[in-house]
Regions:
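Conserved alpha/beta core of the MobA/IspD/sugar-nucleotide pyrophosphorylase nucleotidyltransferase superfamily
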Residues: 2-3, 12-16, 157, 162-206
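Nucleotide phosphate-binding site architecture
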Residues: 28, 40, 156-157, 197
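Conserved nucleotide-sugar donor-binding
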Residues: 146-157, 193
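Nucleotide and nucleotide-moiety/phosphate-recognizing core
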Residues: 14-145, 175-183
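A conserved catalytic-core signature of glycosyltransferases
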Residues: 144-146, 151, 166, 185
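Short aromatic/basic micro-patch
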Residues: 41, 120, 150, 189-190
Length: 206
């Protein structure tokens, strides 16, 4: 279900054919706060908004947010396309599947996906992965491979349709296709209330 759609590339250049996808449908069950973690603030901004703004600023052809467990419309910018994943309880793979199905209908030839709970992934990482000359590219932060991950349309049919593994399945099964790109930033996700408190108490990589 498309909740709203007002996002187009703002660039005057020829379209890249790649959309950014922020996965933000999970329940965040490990987070013991009074609100869903994606609505909690990091540096005065809702966590999911921090991640979405970084993706949107990359200037890819479209920025898509997949939500499910909690309504995020009130904190998202108007420029994004919001998809509601009604099957979110079946795992993150369902959100990625919903995104690539939509991206295919829009004529995109690839998607770059990241997570809504990673506030330290900068726009530059989205740009680098989005422009990678490979159908399977992943950001590498100090040697650790983490989202954003680019998946070309030729590989979409190989993605799982359910479960908590999405792009990781391809990275593991098709290592010969993977292009790892060194990126600056902090790929840590906010899973617990302690993670949030730690992030907000330090100025590291802000």
């Amino acid at each position: 279900v498309i909740e709203n759609h007002s996002n187009e590339s703002h660039s005057n250049e020829r379209p890249l054919g790649v959309a950014a996808v922020v996965l933000a449908a999970g329940a965040g069950e490990r987070f013991a706060g009074q609100r869903h973690k994606l609505l909690c603030e990091v540096d005065g901004v809702p966590l999911v908004r921090r991640a979405v703004d970084a993706a949107l600023a990359a200037g890819l052809d479209e920025t898509i947010v997949v939500m499910g467990a909690v309504d995020l419309l009130g904190v998202l910018p108007d420029e994004v396309t919001v998809l509601h994943n009604e099957a979110w309880q079946q795992g993150q793979a369902t959100s990625l599947a919903a995104a690539v199905n939509y991206a295919g209908s829009r004529g995109h030839r690839g998607v770059v996906f990241g997570c809504g709970d990673q506030p330290g992934v900068p726009t530059e990482a989205w740009v680098a992965i989005g422009h990678a000359d490979s159908d399977l590219a992943v950001a590498e932060f100090n040697g650790a491979r983490r989202p954003p991950v680019k998946i070309g349309a030729a590989l979409w049919s190989h993605l799982p349709l359910s479960g908590d593994e999405g792009g990781r399945v391809l990275l593991r099964r098709r290592p010969e296709l993977v292009k790892a790109i060194a990126c600056e930033g902090n790929p840590d996700d906010i899973d617990t209330l302690e993670d949030l408190k730690k992030w907000n108490s330090t100025t590291l990589l802000r």
